[in-house]
Amino acid sequence: MWRTKTLESMLCSPMKCSSSNIGGSYAQSSKEVSNTTKREVHLPPCSSIMHAPLTPEINQAALPPPAYHYAPSSLHQTEDPVWRSSPNSIIFSPVIATPQPFPLTFVERQSCCPIYSTAASSYTAQSVPPSMQHFQEENHRAVSNEQYSLPNVHIGQNPGTLLSQTQTDLDLIQKQLRAVVKLRKQCPICGKVCSRPSTLRTHYLIHTGDTPFKCTWEHCNKSFNVKSNMLRHLRTHQKKIAKKKHQ
């Protein structure tokens, strides 16, 4: 028992001393800090505090250049400026949002790719309400009629009437062509229709009186409006010479 009491007295005595010393040192340090704060701190007047700006002034020269972070975007981009703060400075980084594209309607898909509209008919039949399905079917029928229908063809028209109509159109075209050809072969003075344009030209020389074809025999000054007549006249000269030789 005596030994245990002595050990307890020995262990407790230094702890008490150390705690008293620590308390005294802490009191001295707190007094010194309060004295220094009273000496060094100078509070400004209330008027200057009331008129001072709320936000602190930031030195622009100390700030680094603004860093812009751009997110990957699709065709439609919207800018959403966000302030991001760092330990050293404030960086303004406009982040570009990437909204999800809206699904194309049936008309837009059909105008872009008609094959896609036929392939996705089963999907649209399940995901579209009945009223919209009716509108889509009507639009699909209209587009198919525009692409594959013949011009000037009415629904319910008899094919025989169509053939007769086309035949009459062809007959009218042929008549017009004949009239044009007839005008090319018809004399504008007497109205005679020639078989060929060349004969029309020779016939026209009769009305004008021109004789462009002259005889090539020496000392013969005859001229003709038709080349065949000139050649016939030239043969007469040759026959006369042949008769003289035989005599």
Swiss-Prot record:
* A Pfam family of this chain: zf-C2H2
Q: From its record, what is one biological process in GO terms?
A: DNA damage checkpoint signaling
* The keyword Lipid metabolism is assigned to this record: no
Identify the Gene3D superfamilies for this entry.
Answer: Classic Zinc Finger (3.30.160.60)
Where are its TM segments located?
none
- Protein's name in the database: Zinc finger protein YPR015C
Q: Name one GO molecular function term.
A: zinc ion binding
Organism the protein comes from: Saccharomyces cerevisiae (strain ATCC 204508 / S288c) (Baker's yeast)
ZnF (C2H2-type) intervals: 185-207, 213-237
Concerning SUPFAM superfamilies, the annotation shows: beta-beta-alpha zinc fingers
